[in-house]
């Protein structure tokens, strides 16, 4: 990195010393976090690099000795773990029964093993991938949902990472200068299997495993996956621009920007890109970068000028990665984004989409890899690439800001980037462990399940294009194509394991869990209120005994735990939990004449370990077709004319927040195994055993006993 690229962050520490805004209502780490670690990250990395350089000979010798001791017991030269997020065992077999071909999956199955893979309870990505990573049940790794609850505010917060603002600040007029640095903490507990492997001196690379942000420090290479924020500090906020007013469009998410005509021009417009919050100014004021857009309706294209650079946009096509820079004084923060000119037709409003602004991997302002230089190295190898955890913009598709075709293009663009990164790392791994998760299958199933025959989805299915209608099958086939390239390189003394964290099924009806808790008297509203706004805006906590949080959880309002808790531990709490369990188990969707809920668990019935106390008090397991409603997921207590269920008409029509036996994942291995009922928990001890390492005592999973 050139010295001039370091000067601005180095100057920044003199006045900013790291800044973060507490978790905001959209449940991101907090807008403004792009500045949170920008200098401290580089400053500390600089001195760590010097220390590492000076101590390298000693560390290399120790690592070599450990490696020699371990490898003499290893059964395989390389262990390769591939994750296909959300690939469903039943759907895979259904495709095969329809005559669809997966020759490379078949090759692995015929040579070794193909089984369903039991997920976690609930079978959702943060819980499942954390169990995969550690081999431990959630009571030992501390991840129970996408969200957990802030006991002081009852607001949701991300379960996987904790962003804490500086403890000390100094205010001078309208400016604020932090005097201490922010803290970024990975909330997952227990050791990952790759950390154990790397500690034995074995070369280890981990790419985009979900819930690895911030990347843990270990003697290997890591690029963080799901959970990594965008430059605004959110989990992915797109922008939408038009020459019409925002109220002309039905958009509830994202950032709307008005395109204003410039003087003396009929086809030139100006707009502003909203960046991270300015850390020096009160009021959460975002930094901005201006752009001009010159449209050609006849050619269905436009020229967009950002800074000194001009780029051509063609209607319906995704742009290249375009660099963006936001300045706060002398500090410049780098991001990258993609544009899609969705519509510039004659007589129609201009529709311009801007992706979430990704952290620029060439100049990362917060830790997205370990070591930091690894993300930079990949950018030199690949060019700009997606760094946001949930890079595929499902919200923009749901809001109809992004077309189905453009979304599919986006998914495969990111998939190709990840393939390139994987094969580069694979080529360098002559002996050791490499782990990679691909996410195209998950994203396609979430958004296109409605197109499957017999899905029963009430959601809109506007397309007749085979690329859209068959998007899920095509994503499975794309994974088979990837496997073809990999199998050409896999040797006899390599162990290949392919897994998914869960399967999939239809999400057709939403259950208003918080409305049910209100109706049953557990969640009480302020006097005169029959419904509550977002984030429990109108709840009377002094009278409430229970509330929903996340996709599957219910928390009691406990004395001494929640700020306004009223439920006493012991008999009272157990009585309430027993009541809720019994009543929920009897809930029926009267309109559809179906049971909505398959099982209800107390947390102690599912989890064991020191972090069980952080789990929801009750975990709800939904029947296929049902899930917590979109309203309850963001803490509305909705009236809905008394209805407890509503159709899910969003494009997000597939899901997996059911019970784990309803959505098994897939397990492939190029060797036979002795166990015929593998679980996600078993992957960690199996990998350790294959590399000659005894699994540690905290691990709950079994060694699958791979046959040599």
Regions picked out by a protein language model, each given a short descriptive name:
Residues 64-113, 699:
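Active-site-proximal N-terminal segment of extracellular/periplasmic enzymes that hydrolyze or transfer
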